[in-house]
Amino acid sequence: MTDTHSIAQPFEAEVSPANNRQLTVSYASRYPDYSRIPAITLKGQWLEAAGFATGTAVVVKVMEGCIVLTAQPAAAEESELMQSLRQVCKLSARKQKQVQDFIGVITGKQKVA
């Protein structure tokens, strides 16, 4: 019970009990000695609903008695211009100069020779 000087504030749980999952730590066999090592397997449609689609990078934080999995946002796709720039950087110095000259011509900063 609360004492006379405190006010009970209702709160909503951060994680709904309906979203809780229970599992048991199993084991995986390790070659060549076939020793048993602890293993946890997570699978189900709920993973995608929680932001863990196939191919998602995951950061794992481990503490005593607690494991936190955090989905990492997908890296923004590189623009077509940046991809082209990376290709130009791999060219010889002569070809890089030709690309620079071409850019100068189409921007009007350089006259056609």
UniProtKB/Swiss-Prot annotation:
Domain SpoVT-AbrB: 29-74
Any one GO CC term of the record: cytoplasm
An MF annotation (GO) of this entry: RNA endonuclease activity
Biological processes, Gene Ontology terms: RNA metabolic process
Gene, per the UniProt record: symE
TM helices/strands, residue ranges: none
Key words, A-Z: Cytoplasm, DNA-binding, Endonuclease, Hydrolase, Nuclease, RNA-binding
Function comment: Involved in the degradation and recycling of damaged RNA. It is itself a target for degradation by the ATP-dependent protease Lon.
Protein's name in the database: Endoribonuclease SymE
Family the UniProt entry places it in: Belongs to the SymE family.
Subcellular location per the Swiss-Prot or TrEMBL entry: Cytoplasm
EC number, UniProt record: 3.1.-.-
